[in-house]
């Protein structure tokens, strides 16, 4: 089983690439955002640490963490964002590693993919056999985020500012998928990358 990381800036199309891998290549998806959300629920691995640090002011009436309240704090203060990451990322990474080992033992899938925008910041690349960077021009990403998620320019600016720059991705990862020319082009690029992955495996 190969572990493939899929990363890129917000709105780049990581989920679309992951969906193709699942439907066409029988891959198993590990989504770091989904794990993080589960761990932030009451009783979750990150809940107590986050509430202890940020205070009960971030809670809703039912005791759950209010995502909008927390986001308003961390996206206006980089130090607090870094603190939030330090409280949550190790827990997510631990769960990711656990799932990978379970899938390796089960021998039921050829690929396990990790979808995350924070591949570099969180150290997920070190548990991957290879990492694919999904690249989409920023202007197109902004258009998608406004159209499909209803984000404002201010929200987009804050998120992009706190993610790795395109130059960092290009320096770190040499397997790039260009998502600017339709789904058929994505299919083609994924097939080529998987062919190379298979060839490398056959020679090892």
Please provide the spans of the model-predicted regions.
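P-loop (Walker A) phosphate-binding loop of NTP-binding proteins
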Residues: 9
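Hydrophobic anchor at the beta1->P-loop junction of P-loop NTPases
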Residues: 6
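ATP-dependent NMP and nucleoside kinases share a basic, alpha-helical "lid"
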Residues: 97-106, 112-147
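Short beta-strand-centered segment that lines the nucleotide-binding/catalytic pocket of NTP-utilizing
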Residues: 27-40
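Walker A/P-loop
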Residues: 15
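Small-molecule kinase domains that catalyze NTP-dependent phosphoryl transfer to phosphate-bearing small molecules
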Residues: 96, 126, 147, 151-197, ...
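ATP-binding Walker
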Residues: 12
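ATP-dependent small-molecule kinase phosphotransfer cores
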Residues: 37-110
């Amino acid at each position: 089983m190969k572990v493939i990381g899929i990363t890129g800036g917000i709105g780049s199309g990581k989920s679309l690439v992951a969906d193709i891998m699942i439907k066409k290549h029988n891959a198993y998806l590990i989504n770091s955002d989904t794990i993080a959300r589960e761990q932030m629920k009451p009783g979750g691995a990150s809940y107590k640490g986050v509430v202890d640090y940020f205070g009960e002011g971030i809670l809703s009436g039912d005791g759950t963490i209010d995502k909008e309240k927390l986001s308003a704090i961390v996206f206006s203060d980089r130090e607090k964002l870094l603190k939030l990451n330090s409280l949550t990322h190790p827990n997510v990474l631990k769960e990711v590693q656990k799932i990978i080992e379970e899938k390796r033992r089960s021998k039921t899938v050829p690929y396990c993919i990790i979808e995350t925008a924070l591949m570099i910041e969180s150290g997920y690349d070190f548990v991957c056999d290879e990492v694919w960077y999904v690249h989409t021009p920023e202007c197109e990403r902004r258009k998608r985020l406004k159209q499909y998620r209803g984000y404002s320019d201010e929200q987009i600016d804050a998120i992009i500012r706190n993610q790795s720059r395109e130059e960092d991705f290009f320096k770190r990862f040499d397997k790039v998928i260009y998502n600017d020319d339709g789904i058929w082009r994505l299919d083609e690029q994924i097939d080529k990358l998987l062919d190379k992955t298979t060839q490398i495996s056959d020679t090892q």
